[in-house]
């Protein structure tokens, strides 16, 4: 039988690997949050899409339910209308956003895999918010460059990024121009399941260690960027909110 210390080490190790969306060191506490605050108030379309996504072999890529709830409320609080999402997967966070926007709200959504998006599209359509979404398949950087060339600077109220971590800084260089002064950019996975503080010899998977270096670089750059105010939150896998101030 494992000792209390061994069980603690096992749980700590699990939280250093991508595969557990909560950064809380207690699974029971996270379950309490979901069962008392998140699931009872989760819109039916989001519940349906979450359950569909859970069957996907890469379901860990989805936004967690508590983070979806957070994004939905945040968008309402800032009265967002024109938004952008880089990295869609099956569309759980996209649906959370679409449900929060007014009837004339818009989301420019980008992902390299349309097939995953189409898995959730029937739910989005049934929820009556598909007309708010302009989905574009392919790499985001060329689209962002075109937006800047077309003079769309300062036209977005909120931008959510949950995509390739090795391009986060490249995204930021462009998004800081596209978000309005007073608008928000949200970068997901900025605590990378706790691996950002794992010791150098921690037994991390190769891709976890690889992307961790980019996440650490991003966190350092955001903290030093005078054009934004930042707030890093331990929601989901860590989300850093950046409010453009200049």
UniProtKB/Swiss-Prot annotation:
InterPro entries: Cation-dep_OMT, SAM-dependent_MTases_sf, SAM_O-MeTrfase
Co-factor requirement: a divalent metal cation
Residues at which substrate binds: 21, 162, 193
Molecular function per GO: caffeoyl-CoA O-methyltransferase activity; metal ion binding
Binding-site list for a divalent metal cation: 162, 188-189
GO biological process: lignin biosynthetic process; methylation
One Pfam family in the UniProt entry: Methyltransf_3
Residues that coordinate or bind S-adenosyl-L-methionine: 63, 85, 87-88, 93, 111, 140, 164
Cofactor binding note of this UniProt entry: Binds 1 divalent metal cation per subunit.
Substrates-to-products reaction catalysed: (E)-caffeoyl-CoA + S-adenosyl-L-methionine = (E)-feruloyl-CoA + S-adenosyl-L-homocysteine + H(+)
UniProt EC number: 2.1.1.104
Alphabetical UniProt keywords: Lignin biosynthesis, Metal-binding, Methyltransferase, S-adenosyl-L-methionine, Transferase
Pathway linked to the protein: Aromatic compound metabolism; phenylpropanoid biosynthesis
Family: Belongs to the class I-like SAM-binding methyltransferase superfamily. Cation-dependent O-methyltransferase family. CCoAMT subfamily.
Function: Methylates caffeoyl-CoA to feruloyl-CoA and 5-hydroxyferuloyl-CoA to sinapoyl-CoA. Plays a role in the synthesis of feruloylated polysaccharides. Involved in the reinforcement of the plant cell wall. Also involved in the responding to wounding or pathogen challenge by the increased formation of cell wall-bound ferulic acid polymers.
Protein name, as recorded: Caffeoyl-CoA O-methyltransferase 1
């Amino acid at each position: 039988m494992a000792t209390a210390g061994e069980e603690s080490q096992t749980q700590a190790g699990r939280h250093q690997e991508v595969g557990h969306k909560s950064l809380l060191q207690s699974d029971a506490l996270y379950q309490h949050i979901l069962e008392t605050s998140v699931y009872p108030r989760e819109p039916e379309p989001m519940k349906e899409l979450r359950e569909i996504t859970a069957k996907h072999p890469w379901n860990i890529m989805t936004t967690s339910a508590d983070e979806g709830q957070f994004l939905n409320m945040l968008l309402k609080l800032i009265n967002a209308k024109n938004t952008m999402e880089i990295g869609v997967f099956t569309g759980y966070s996209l649906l959370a956003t679409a449900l929060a926007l007014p009837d004339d709200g818009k989301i420019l959504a980008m992902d390299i895999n349309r097939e995953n998006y189409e898995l959730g599209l029937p739910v989005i359509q049934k929820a009556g918010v598909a007309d708010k979404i302009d989905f574009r398949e392919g790499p985001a950087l060329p689209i962002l460059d075109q937006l800047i060339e077309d003079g769309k600077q300062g036209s977005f109220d909120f931008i959510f990024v949950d995509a390739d971590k090795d391009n986060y800084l490249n995204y930021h260089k462009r998004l800081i121009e596209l978000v309005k002064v007073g608008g928000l950019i949200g970068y997901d996975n900025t605590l990378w399941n706790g691996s950002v503080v794992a010791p150098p010899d921690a037994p991390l998977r190769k891709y976890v260690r690889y992307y961790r270096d980019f996440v650490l670089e991003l966190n350092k750059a955001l903290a030093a960027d005078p054009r934004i105010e930042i707030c890093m939150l331990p929601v989901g896998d860590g989300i850093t909110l950046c409010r453009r101030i200049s």
